[in-house]
Amino acid sequence: MKENAKENELVKKLTNKHYTITTAESCTGGLLSATIINVSGASDVINCAYVTYANEAKENLVSVSHETLETKGAVSKETAAEMCVGCAKAAKADKIGRASCRERV
């Protein structure tokens, strides 16, 4: 696959700062992590990647509460926030951030 300048820049910046990244994805199906992993040198910055499409995976791997999934849905800002926090705890991350799909109507 063709490497994109933005992905290269991200990997370079993370490498220079000695940062690693862990992702937790759902509706993107691993596209974010795959895009980063496609860059040469990504093994220095990728810690792990969770693809938690099923609700059970969200609960078991990244600690999303069953209640949140039942009341807010799998594709909601609340679920995305819990995925972010759970992923960070599982990976023992120093910093967290998130990007999510638009909430479905």
Which stretches of residues belong to each language-model region?
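Short alpha-helical segments enriched in small residues
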Residues: 1-104
